[in-house]
Amino acid sequence: MSKPVITRFAPSPTGYLHIGGARTALFNWLYAKHCGGKMLLRIEDTDRERSTEAATAAILDGLTWLGLDWDGEAISQFERAPRHREVAEELVANGKAYYCYASPEELEEMREKARAEGRPPRYDGRWRDRDPSEAPAGVKPVIRIKAPRDGETVVHDAVQGDVRFPNKDLDDFIILRSDGTPTYMHAVVVDDHDMGVTHIIRGDDHLTNAARQTIIYNAMGWDVPQMSHIPLIHGADGAKLSKRHGALGVDAYRAIGYLPAALRNYLVRLGWSHGDDEIMSTEQMIEWFDVKDINKGAARFDFQKLEAINGLYMRSSDDQALFDALVAVLPEIEGGKELAEALDDKGRAQLLLAMPGLKERAKTLVELADGAKFIFASRPLALDEKAASLLNDEGRAVLKPVYPVLEAVGEWTAESLDAAIRAHAEAEGLKLGKIAQPLRAALTGRATSPGVFDVLVVLGREESLARIGDQIG
């Protein structure tokens, strides 16, 4: 019987959860769900100077916001240091690793010699077979793995295929430093083994690490997990995604106003596809996702495409769910605090009533919030440039007879208002747009908004007439 699939996401808490890490977490999560397995979370916090609790919290928060849950408690790599030392000592006892007492001066000499001979710097193995009795007094050794010197180490990769590394290029690397702390290379192997990880899905910048880690697995006689090294994400210009391409952290995308479901949908398509399907539910992703379908080539991040997908998700969202998502993100967006303060019971009801019209025009929650500002604007409204041009003498003249028409409307509904304005336009020999444009400007201070009859309903009779009155004098 085959083992249950166990994947892991193992971020370093030295900063935010970046977009590449989010995609790696998503792929691990989807594959575990697809196989009926588990995804574990390990915080690789061995770099004590750079690791922070705030960064750990931000990573956990980012994963939770994206809807990526993990099984069990998050594991701290730093807290497992005694176990890492134990395995390193076991390797020495079994003749698979050794104490190295080479001084910094000796190591520098090796590097200089390699440079002079035009070869990559490599440790020359001088302590590999020496008798420990020759150890210099008072020197704390490092522990180095006894890497094979002949042949090659093969990484069997589900995405890249078999990747071969000549063993002559893989020196006896350090697994335990002289202060007793493990190297990243060693700690990762011990943790993955002890956690029962069966499948490792990570960026292809770890491919060379995979060869060295395979050597440690083999030295311990442990099964090597199935590796899948996925291509990195590049910007639209083909260069590795960096700050100059725009937002990098998941928290930034949240603050910009993307929906987690839309970001998930966009990320899953970066390097993986299912036919021509662009939009897919989480259930479909889980059903269809398989590492063997991940592309070898780098995926390009396209902000416009993400925005289009987010807009589609917003338009298809339930109004109440979108309202809740907007309210949740208000503290994080520019101008959001003022909008949040305006959301008393009446304001909340108005915003929810406006949602069908607002979401048709917005591609992000920030745009949605901006579109909703007219509801809470103080009178007299500040007009933007286009609105001011619509409310010139001609526009005000068109608007003046509209006031009594609206005042006379009995039932203040979009249908009744539409009928009244259309009848007035016909009687005056005007096209509807000739009235709707200055009317919209007077009601919202802008030239664009949801449908003008919807705006009238959201604002209500009293506020609508007052705003029109301000403009016609």
UniProtKB/Swiss-Prot annotation:
Motif ('HIGH' region): 11-21
GO biological process, one term: glutamyl-tRNA aminoacylation
Matches recorded under Pfam families: Anticodon_2, tRNA-synt_1c
Basic and acidic residues compositional bias, start-end: 113-133
Annotated segments matching region Disordered: 113-136
Main location: cytoplasm
Record's signal peptide: none
A GO MF label: glutamate-tRNA ligase activity
CDD domains: GluRS_core
Domain of life: Bacteria
Binding residue positions for ATP: K243
Reaction catalysis annotation: tRNA(Glu) + L-glutamate + ATP = L-glutamyl-tRNA(Glu) + AMP + diphosphate
Keywords in alphabetical order: Aminoacyl-tRNA synthetase, ATP-binding, Cytoplasm, Ligase, Nucleotide-binding, Protein biosynthesis
Location in or out of the cell: Cytoplasm
Enzyme category, top tier: ligase
Documented EC number(s): 6.1.1.17
Entry similarity comment: Belongs to the class-I aminoacyl-tRNA synthetase family. Glutamate--tRNA ligase type 1 subfamily.
Summary of subunit composition and partner proteins: Monomer.
NCBIfam families assigned to the protein according to its UniProt record, in alphabetical order: gltX_bact
UniProt-recorded name of the protein: Glutamate--tRNA ligase 2
Source lineage: Bacteria, Pseudomonadati, Pseudomonadota, Alphaproteobacteria, Hyphomicrobiales
Gene from which the chain derives: gltX2
